Design a protein with these regions (language model features):
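Conserved hydrolase catalytic core segment
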Residues: 58-67
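Gly/Ala-rich beta-loop-alpha elbow adjacent to hydrolase catalytic centers
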Residues: 48-56
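Short beta-strand/loop motif that positions the catalytic acidic residue
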Residues: 95, 101-103
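Active-site nucleophile loop of the alpha/beta-hydrolase fold
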Residues: 7-8, 69-78, 106, 125
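Catalytic histidine-centered segment of alpha/beta-hydrolase-like enzymes
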Residues: 125-138
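Serine-hydrolase catalytic machinery in alpha/beta-hydrolase-like enzymes
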Residues: 1-43, 88, 122
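Conserved alpha/beta-hydrolase "acid-adjacent" motif
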Residues: 104, 108-113
Length: 151
């Protein structure tokens, strides 16, 4: 079962995201619904693209996800004035389940490092990951097949 979830602020037609706490609460509610009505005891692999990847990472313990898939994780926020951007690496380091990050080689939001349970695959392109969608799909498929999670 695959569920495509659109963030509430996008559904409402807004360009700016809601505060992290509200995004996380909405995500947890969706996962609770899926666990009750859709997953039928199957493992949960949470994931998202860009901001959605951050939400999946921040909520991994609350949702009980067995693994996390991050497409275009925004490691560094856009620079603002003279203030250096603050890395979001702690959000990745807090994840204790297997994780795949698929990142564009020229992603302006940075390149996350590999970690103990964190595999990083770089593909041609930028933050949009549209240049080589076949490579993105292949990386995800290979990772899913190799996951040590019972089906």
């Amino acid at each position: 079962t695959v569920a495509l979830v659109e963030q509430p602020y996008r559904v409402a037609g807004r360009r700016s995201p809601a505060p992290a706490k509200r995004l996380d609460e909405a995500w947890i509610a969706v996962i609770e619904h899926l666990r009750t009505d859709e997953l039928d005891g199957r493992p949960l692999i949470a994931g998202g693209r860009s901001l959605g990847a951050r939400v999946a990472c921040r909520t991994v313990e609350a949702t009980g996800a067995e693994a996390v898939l991050c497409l275009a994780f925004p490691l560094l926020p856009p620079a603002r004035g003279n203030k250096p951007p603050q890395s979001r690496l702690p959000e990745l380091e807090a994840v204790s389940v297997p994780m795949l990050i698929v990142q564009g080689e020229s992603d302006r939001f940075g390149r996350p490092p590999e970690g103990a349970d964190r595999q990083v695959v770089r593909v041609a392109g930028d933050h949009g990951l549209k240049k080589d969608t076949a490579a993105v799909g292949a990386a995800v498929a290979d990772w899913l097949i190799a996951l040590p999670i019972p089906a």
